[in-house]
């Protein structure tokens, strides 16, 4: 049982990295094969050669008849079967250990690169390559190993080989022994002088164990087939799911389009707010405060808003009847767009704007014409 415990320990490690079907298969292997073979079956076949008797006194006849009837013992045959069907699983375990070793190396290298990154080194490309390698090996966060890529192929190959070995050993057992034991075996072989009859001990008990091991082999084969289909359809499902939404998995959701002409966009995205027009009651020397227009995305917006504000101000002056008034130099506001090389315009302080006059369509009376010819003290010189 010492050898069985070592094999069971190795297979127990595989169970931590196997899907549901693989865990069920390992449970069947442990309980109904290894445990049963190590306890009941060995005791049932313990006296198989010593209890094999033939009705002859010829020396060596019993040995050659036993060798003809049982080329290999059932117990040793089942031991070979368990070893062969476990080897692909152990190869998968070796691949898992290889991936875990790679994970340790990649994590160590990633920590070194992050330390270098804190010192100011540009290691973004190397970190991205490490992430790609982790995805290739199927390594996820918290040390979890996901079955994909080479690991998935190794697991599928192990299932195929286990199924092939199960079928092969069932066929070999059927060819050598059949699936039942007889109580009497007829033997005619040298050095037996004639045809002799040989008798087997406990044939019914041994037949029951043979049928039981046959059923366990069929169950294991069925579990392998189910697991193979499950892994295949799961891989197809994951691939279809990855192809159906590839953009959101890489770049994330799209951001809404931004209207640079809206005041909300100008405020929340770093654009300067449109310049308010001068009020008619603005004191002399009052200057408008403009924001920073280095943001190229809002330059056109600020320019159009400023022109519109001055047009609105002109209309307001005309409506209020302030004809002939001019805007003093102190009211002039420079508008500078330093980043616009082609369409840059600047209203320098000291440049007079054209007077905004209201056109009166009514005919002037004679009194008003005479009154208008007299100078008044509050008239402004132009």
Swiss-Prot record:
Annotated organism of origin: Canis lupus familiaris (Dog)
Subunit-level organization: A connexon is composed of a hexamer of connexins. Interacts with SGSM3. Interacts with RIC1/CIP150. Interacts with CNST and CSNK1D. Interacts (via C-terminus) with TJP1. Interacts (via C-terminus) with SRC (via SH3 domain). Interacts (not ubiquitinated) with UBQLN4 (via UBA domain). Interacts with NOV. Interacts with TMEM65. Interacts with ANK3/ANKG and PKP2.
Post-translational modification: Phosphorylation at Ser-325, Ser-328 and Ser-330 by CK1 modulates gap junction assembly. Phosphorylated at Ser-368 by PRKCG; phosphorylation induces disassembly of gap junction plaques and inhibition of gap junction activity. Phosphorylation at Ser-368 by PRKCD triggers its internalization into small vesicles leading to proteasome-mediated degradation.
Disulfide bonds: 54-192, 187-198
Protein name in UniProt: Gap junction alpha-1 protein
Residues bearing PTM Phosphoserine: 5, 255, 257, 262, 306, 314, 325, 328, 330, 344, 365, 368-369, 373
Crosslink position(s): Glycyl lysine isopeptide (Lys-Gly) (interchain with G-Cter in SUMO): 144, 237
GO biological process, one term: bone development
Any Pfam family the entry gives: Connexin43
């Amino acid at each position: 049982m010492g050898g069985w415990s070592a094999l069971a320990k190795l297979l127990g490690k595989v169970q931590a990295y196997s899907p549901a079907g693989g865990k069920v298969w390992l449970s069947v292997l442990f309980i109904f094969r290894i445990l049963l073979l190590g306890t009941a079956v060995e005791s049932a076949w313990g006296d198989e050669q010593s209890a094999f008797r033939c009705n002859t006194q010829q020396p060596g006849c019993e040995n050659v008849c036993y060798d003809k009837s049982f080329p290999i013992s059932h117990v040793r045959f089942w031991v070979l079967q368990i070893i062969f069907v476990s080897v692909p699983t152990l190869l998968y375990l070796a691949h898992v250990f290889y991936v875990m070793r790679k994970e340790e190396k990649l994590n160590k290298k990633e920590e070194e690169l992050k330390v270098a990154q804190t010192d100011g080194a540009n290691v973004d490309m190397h970190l991205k390559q490490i992430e790609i390698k982790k995805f290739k090996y199927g390594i996820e966060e918290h040390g979890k190993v996901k079955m994909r890529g080479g690991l998935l192929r190794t697991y599928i190959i192990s299932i195929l080989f286990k199924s092939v070995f199960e079928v092969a050993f069932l066929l070999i057992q059927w060819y050598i022994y059949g699936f039942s034991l007889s109580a009497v075996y007829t033997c005619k072989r040298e050095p037996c002088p004639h045809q002799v009859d040989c008798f087997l001990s406990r044939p019914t008990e041994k037949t029951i164990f043979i049928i039981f091991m046959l059923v366990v082999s069929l169950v294991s084969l069925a579990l392998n087939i189910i697991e193979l289909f499950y892994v295949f359809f799961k891989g197809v499902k994951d691939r279809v799911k990855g192809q159906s939404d590839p953009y959101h998995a890489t770049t994330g959701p799209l951001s809404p389009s931004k209207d640079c002409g809206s005041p909300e966009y100008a405020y929340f995205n770093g654009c300067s707010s449109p310049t308010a027009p001068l009020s008619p009651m603005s004191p002399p020397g009052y200057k408008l405060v403009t924001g920073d227009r280095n943001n190229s995305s809002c330059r056109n917006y600020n320019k159009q808003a400023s022109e519109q504000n001055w047009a609105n101000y002109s209309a307001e002056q005309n409506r209020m009847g302030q004809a002939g008034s001019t805007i003093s130099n102190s009211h002039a506001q420079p508008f500078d767009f330093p980043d616009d090389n082609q369409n840059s315009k600047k209203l320098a302080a000291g440049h007079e704007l054209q007077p905004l006059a209201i056109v009166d369509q009514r005919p002037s009376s004679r009194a008003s014409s005479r009154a208008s010819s007299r100078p008044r003290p509050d008239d402004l010189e132009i």
